[in-house]
Regions:
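Exposed aromatic-hydrophobic patches
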Residues: 123-129
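Sensory beta-strand/linker motifs that couple input domains to effectors
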Residues: 8
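Short coil/turn segments at secondary-structure boundaries
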Residues: 177, 192-195
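Residues that scaffold the ATP/ADP-binding catalytic core of kinase and kinase-like folds
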Residues: 96, 114, 146-147
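DG-centered beta-turn motif at the end of beta-strands
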Residues: 11, 91, 140-142, 193
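Active-site-proximal, acidic helix/loop segment immediately C-terminal to a metal-coordinating Asp/Glu
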Residues: 16-40, 102, 130-188
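Catalytic core of PPM/PP2C metal-dependent serine/threonine phosphatase domains
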Residues: 1-5, 17-98, 105, 119-122, ...
């Protein structure tokens, strides 16, 4: 829209029906936001999504907390303007360059769940898109929190970042992470959905 592309990675509350319910609502609201709002500011998109969620879940009427909500990361970029922006609601971004992997932390607040004062004032990370491409990765805590190994510990962020650093490209990184998490999990129960998104610009 107007030369800007928006990518959203979201991790909704719950499993089964509650998770599907939040996924459907959030997807519908994001479609609405994309049709009526500017797509160049990820912080505004997160703020608008939280406002619409409050109305959809009737939080502004009941003033009560709910178990329905989500964590999300929003990437906005323009190939014409050569600008990339990111804002996160309890979700971080990882940028791989020739110098290594850099963690861009999102804000420590989720969307939904309870009534909030707006605007939420999410931080915005911005960088220029150079001729030499960068790789970007966003993933949910289902990846890092998977229990496995001999000591039945969580997979952890360090293992994810190791796979990103060692991979030759984005596709290899994603495939290697998924395969390594499954290997690490072994016979242990899957704790959560695995959401992992990588792309190069």
């Amino acid at each position: 829209k107007n030369g800007w592309t928006c990518l959203v990675v979201a991790d909704c509350t719950g499993h089964g029906i509650p998770g599907a319910f939040m996924t459907l609502i959030s997807s519908t609201l994001l479609d609405r936001i994309s049709s009526i709002k500017d797509l160049s500011h990820p912080d505004t998109i997160l703020n608008d999504l939280d406002e619409f969620l409050q109305k959809s879940l009737s939080l502004d009427d009941t003033h009560q907390e709910t178990d329905f909500g989500l964590d999300a990361g929003v990437c906005c970029f323009s190939l014409d303007a050569k600008i990339f922006r990111y804002s996160g609601a309890k979700m971080n971004l990882y940028q791989k360059t020739d110098q290594g992997v850099v963690e861009i932390k999102g804000d420590k607040k989720s969307l939904g769940y309870d009534i909030k004062e707006h605007p939420l004032n999410f931080k915005v990370f911005e960088c220029a898109l150079n001729e030499k491409p960068s790789s970007f990765f966003v993933f949910s805590d289902g990846v890092t929190d998977q229990v496995g190994g001999e000591k039945k510990l969580m997979y952890g962020k360090k293992r994810v970042l190791h796979q990103i650093r060692e991979a030759v490209d984005v596709k290899a990184a994603v495939n290697n992470i998924v395969a390594d998490v499954e290997r690490y999990q072994g016979v242990n129960k899957r704790r959560d959905d695995l959401t992992l998104f990588g792309f190069a610009l």
